């Protein structure tokens, strides 16, 4: 496919600063579309422009953090911009980015990138010659970038080998020109109807079934407060007082109940 359209010889990649990152998982998932993942390897540098993410905000039943902190997911509780890497179904590593203020948990799964630098090296890592399929999907991405559990907890905004960046230079497509689509997330059973997957419309590097890809642009961040919903569900239901108690003994022709207020109870 030649030189990536978003990256030319006059382009450069600047590291993202933590101050630039939204401290909200859903907003950060959208913000990361068009940004870059870079891994500095001994054999060379590989990089890719993020074209697809999924958000797993606080209280999300589909998130690893739903039941609270454990040593395995401690990276999810770090400040926005840290790597959370897990091994999925004993087969693939997956790269996530922490998305909430330190002490709270939320994660963004990086689902797909458009390869920019080190493409031949990525093909070697994947034993794959198909550019379109090289990093389309979180497992493929991690394999192409050689990301594993040793990278869990890395500060992606610091001077580390694995980091997040933004493309700068002449002819670079600005974020405002990128049209972001939204759909439900892929491959989950809990909270499967929530629209928390974001992608660059028109990108051939986006993963998943094509039937999910709509044409409408993202209209704005949808705040889905799983924590509030969970607390509301757990709150005990208030009992009716005598003043508002429904007298179900009253009947009309046809046997239907009449909703009337009962008077004070008579002493027996």
Sequence positions of predicted segments:
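Conserved, well-structured core segments that form or line functional sites
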Residues: 2-240, 259-268
